[in-house]
Amino acid sequence: MQQIVIGTAGHIDHGKTALVKALTGTNTDQLAQEKARGMTIDLGFAYLNEQITIIDVPGHEKFIRNMAAGAANVHIGMLVVAADDGIMPQTKEHLQILDSFSIQGGLVVLTKVDIVNDEEWIDLVELELQALIKNTVLNGAPIIRVNNLTGDGIEAVKKHLLHTAKEVKIQIRSNEFRMHVDRVFSKKGFGTVVTGTVDSGELHVGDKLELLPNKVDAKVRGIQTHGGNVDSVGVGDRAALNLANVERTEVYRGTVLSNPGIIAVTKKVIAHIIMYPDTDWTIKNNQRIRLHIGTAEIMGKVSMATPKLKKGENGSVIIGLEISLSVACLLYTSPSPRDLSTSRMPSSA
């Protein structure tokens, strides 16, 4: 049974969490700090049905690393834009991240239309959105207006998501199990629990795992998906794994779980960097940059044949990592928390 992951995207306070709640009945802002501040800080999860998970990501620029972590395994993108604000900085940045991951479909949701009395303004925002998504992975995607007060448009959003989910084709890249950890917590009576989306292979209760890059051995004590206990999980599944023989301090976001002995760790990667045309910075030779690799965040230094890469340019580089890491995914580079370019690289597994 194929599992599909939908990821929200969009600027802070544009209604992503409220939209997810309207679709699923779940408030994904679970942290006390999130509820107090009225904003999403970390990843939140809700279920549209037994096969579809929605990941609610933070919209604030300070938490862009969490958005990148959440988007790492998304199949369908849902770009959320408030009608009163229109296109904002993180609208563009989140769209670039979705575009980089080559998601298989999606839509744009225009929220808060109930607080805008000017129909011409809403039409203008919609035209600007059509121009924004042109030549991206969301090119031609529907733009659905949602009234936050009456709920008008919610059923149309749900219908489109369900239809798109049926068209998703999950690529089987390897028969070996691999999963990037995006959350870790301890539960009384259970011990250490990690969550993530299965990248490849299958996992069963009782299987042995290796935690990288620290090379910690673990055994799967229990598995949950969509809130229920299961015996196994496969590609695309959102999974919570109860790990035996693992201390809470030995695993963290960015850890890669795999079958023992199949993935190496490295401190050097070869990548192809694409600088977006609207970025306002350059990457220079020997520059120290921030990388978002899978669900990990790490610093590294760029080595390349040319003095620099400017906006609109692309090129192959070698990136020296400051700590060893298991690399088998897309990575993101940024000289600051708010600026991202994409770097595509081959899998090492």
Predicted region positions:
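Switch I (G2) and immediately adjacent beta-strands of P-loop GTPase domains
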Residues: 30-76
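Conserved Switch II/interswitch segment of TRAFAC-class P-loop GTPases
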Residues: 73-92, 104-107, 113-121
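Conserved catalytic-core segments of large NTP-driven translation/proteostasis enzymes
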Residues: 131-277
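Conserved G1/Walker A P-loop phosphate-binding module
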Residues: 1-33, 44-48
